[in-house]
Amino acid sequence: MVGSYAAGGGRGAAVAAVAEGKLDELRRRMGKADGDLLRIVGVGGGAWGSAFCALLQDAYGRHRDKAQVRVWRRPGRAVDRATAEHLFEVINSREDVLRRLIRRCAYLKYVEARLGDRTLYADEILRDGFCLNMVDTPLCPLKVVTNLQEAVWDADIVINGLPSTETREVFGEIGRYWKERIRPPVIISLAKGIEASIDPVPRIITPTQMISNATGVPLENILYLGGPNIASEIYNKEYANARICGADKWRKPLAKFLRQPHFIVWDNSDLITHEVMGGLKNIYAIGAGMVAALTNESATSKSVYFSLCTSEMIYITHLLAEDPEKLAGPLLADTYVTLLKGRNAWYGQKLAKGELTLEMGDSIKGKGTIQGVSAVHAFYELLSQSSLSVTHPEVKKLVAPVELCPILKTLYKILIKRELATDSILQAIRDESMYDPRERIEMSQRQCLYRPSLLGLPKVDITQA
């Protein structure tokens, strides 16, 4: 089956033995006694969260006496008739999926839904291996729980598959269920986006910070996983790599546990840069989609846009980290693939083609939340604050950081203020007065841009840093 780690003969036995060894090693590190399951819980039923949990189920689900993978998603989300019809086509195009559903006595309900005689629900189809935001890519069957307390109360590892816009609310509720816990769980966040707070001082709040604040789980137990992750491609065994970022205590053992033959996971200590880049890339992906649509997929225009937007991203990270991780490896690959393909780039294309409008909102059927929209607002508001002023390299005067980010400014005026049309993004990258993006990068490295207060850290004398 595509997406399964099952293999025949000796190779299958070898793969299973390696997986069991990694599972046993993590169980020992987490202090699990014999007979006490390692409970892995995915929170959120979006495409990447569901696919990630399905990867773990494929890898470790066979060891039922040692590990359990389950997913929480909200109940009550109905599958519309058009999606049900398409899902039926997908099922019948895949013999392995068709046989599995017949064997599980689950096929008939999809026939009835196609005919309009039955309503399917998102949690119901996820149990059968279908994510509502990714029905073209069948997953393995998953254990799905719709009661949040039941799902998370005894979790050892929690996978945050929620959008950043929902993370605070859901983990605030989870925090109430964990008040009596003696040992905090380990949390791996897949969320890509940030919140901005202006009062009392400008600062960003990343998903890992939201989770820690909401639950009381120490930051050393909360990690971020990012990389070039197109969910359907990774589940279908397209080769990919990723980084798990956070404190020393957990990132190395988790990198080893998560690594699969086609999904290579490295570890990195720079949590902030990776989380911030995870939010920034969604912003610039919307613009990339617009450029692609408006230029008839011009490779030259897209490459010009890529060079300009990555220089803005590098500049912004120097405000948030004293020595930010270089835009290379999985960090660069994540940016590239998101600008090339993904829901945010898709959204930008549809806006530029007139097939979607801003009035339709940023939650799109079959795609989920377009996180780049809220990220545009957050970063623009944050970087507009005069208290963060930097020296303009040409006029030698203090300006708000956003004044050195013309693409971010343009996207804000298109998406949030709605003052400009989508073709304004082309004017932003074709401005004759624009300087070489290399100059922005050199300026960020030359000037002391780091503002620890943006992370809620005490102010330091950066001239002596």
Swiss-Prot record:
Where is it chiefly localized? Answer: cytoplasm
Which reaction is catalysed here? sn-glycerol 3-phosphate + NAD(+) = dihydroxyacetone phosphate + NADH + H(+)
Mind naming one GO cellular-component term on file for this protein? cytosol
Listed binding positions for substrate are: K192, R343, N344
- Tell me the Gene Ontology biological-process terms attached to this UniProt entry: carbohydrate metabolic process; glycerol-3-phosphate catabolic process; glycerol-3-phosphate metabolic process
Gene Ontology MF terms in the entry? glycerol-3-phosphate dehydrogenase (NAD+) activity; NAD binding
Query: Which catalytic residues are annotated?
Result: K281
> Which compartments is it annotated to reside in?
Cytoplasm, Cytosol
Chain sites annotated for binding NAD(+): G44, G45, G46, A47, W48, G49, K192, A231, R343, Q371
Q: Which Pfam families match?
A: NAD_Gly3P_dh_C, NAD_Gly3P_dh_N
Q: Which UniProt keyword terms apply here?
A: Cytoplasm, NAD, Oxidoreductase
- Which superkingdom is the protein from? Eukaryota
Write down the EC number: 1.1.1.8
Q: Spell out the InterPro entries in the cross-references.
A: 6-PGluconate_DH-like_C_sf, 6PGD_dom2, G3P_DH_NAD-dep, G3P_DH_NAD-dep_C, G3P_DH_NAD-dep_N, NAD(P)-bd_dom_sf
Give the protein's function.
May be involved in cell redox homeostasis.
Q: What protein family is recorded?
A: Belongs to the NAD-dependent glycerol-3-phosphate dehydrogenase family.
Q: What is this protein called?
A: Probable glycerol-3-phosphate dehydrogenase [NAD(+)] 3, cytosolic
